[in-house]
UniProtKB/Swiss-Prot annotation:
Family affiliation: Belongs to the geminiviridae replication enhancer protein family.
UniProt subunit comment: Homooligomer. Interacts with the replication-associated protein (REP). Interacts with host proliferating cell nuclear antigen (PCNA). Interacts with host retinoblastoma-related protein 1 (RBR1), and may thereby deregulate the host cell cycle. Oligomerization and interaction with PCNA are necessary for optimal replication enhancement.
Organism from which the protein derives: Tomato yellow leaf curl Sardinia virus (isolate Spain-2)
UniProt key word Transit peptide: no
Name of this chain's protein: Replication enhancer protein
Disulphide-bonded residues: none
Function: Increases viral DNA accumulation. Enhances infectivity and symptom expression.
InterPro entries: Gemini_AL3
A Pfam short name: Gemini_AL3
Length: 134
């Protein structure tokens, strides 16, 4: 849903994309929180954010696009290593498709978390998307 207007994102907006070779560094990955074994459980809680680059947002007609993911996993790898492998796998998936769009980024994250990484228990996705009005 568009945060600015409250309207649902149309299929055309979600699937319109840009070729991967046209834009360098289209996505920015950051880990916002890492809770190691909260409440003495055997799970780790990772919260990370994917931001769309200025050139990608300009090409797609987006004013702001933050995709926030909260992951429950039993992986015990260091945070930096997890982010580096995750980022590499997402870019690899997007390069195989050849087009970067909102739907393709979400599909890439889903593929990496549930097919590439093992021991992913649950993922909650929140987004902050604002399309250009003009």
């Amino acid at each position: 849903m568009d945060l600015r207007t409250g309207e649902y994102i149309t299929a055309h907006q979600a699937t319109s994309g840009v070729y991967t070779f046209e834009i360098t560094n289209p996505l920015y990955f950051t880990i916002t929180r890492h809770n190691q074994q909260p409440f003495n459980s055997k799970y780790n809680l990772l919260t990370f954010q994917i931001r769309f680059n200025h050139n990608l947002r300009k090409a797609l007609g987006i004013h702001k696009c933050f995709l926030n993911f909260r992951i429950w996993t039993t992986l015990q790898s260091p945070t930096g290593h997890f982010l580096r492998v995750f980022r590499f796998q997402v870019y690899k998936y997007l390069n195989n498709i050849g087009v970067i769009s909102l739907n393709n980024v979400i599909r890439a994250v889903d593929y990496v978390l549930f097919d590439v990484f093992e021991n992913t228990i649950d993922v909650i996705e929140q987004h902050e998307i604002k399309y250009n009005l003009y």
